[in-house]
Amino acid sequence: MRIIVKLFFIIFIFSSLTNADALITKKLENDAQKKYGDFAKNRFISIDEELIKGLKDASEIKKLNVVNRWVNYIKYSSDKKVYKKSDYWATLYEFVGKNKGDCEDYVIAKYYILKELGVSPKKMKFTYVIYRSRSGKKISHMVLSYLKVPNPKSKNDVLILGNNNRRVLPASKRKDLIKVIKMINGDTGPKSKKWKKLEANMKRKKL
């Protein structure tokens, strides 16, 4: 009997730790409701049920398309308006909770959801680009790049997940992205202070 009780206790502790490490937890959903209201809680439930659980067995391409479309429904707003800062990398939780953010926030949200879905971080790059708007204005921008093959030689082997275009397209089809400034390897390469701060905030599920 004691052995059974001990085994049950070990399983319970292990399960609790595993749930705490999940991208979306019940505690997070309830905390989001307290801070932002029912809409925010329902959005996190949607991530967990529709995306993480619903796409678990889907192809990688389908995961990219569905996650990209879901995240792009969030409203665009500058860091100055939302956080009173010129540049701020919001967590997935802040971005979804507030239901607004800028281009980096879309990239961060897509990255972490796709990572939770089993997409290798080595395939995903935070990519700084110059974007040409419909009016012809050149703007600094960030998109998430997905590498179909390691060290791609062709633009057709890089898929772009951006917030200015709701479709996932090969880089060769994104004529509005006129120059790549640099690519960041996410959590697989050298980490900047900004990245380390984001990781710490994600770990504590900062809302």
Name each region found by the language model:
Residues T18-L207:
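A structural boundary/capping signal
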Residues I11-N19:
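Hydrophobic h-region of N-terminal signal peptides that target proteins for export
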Residues R2-I10:
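Sec-dependent signal peptide recognition
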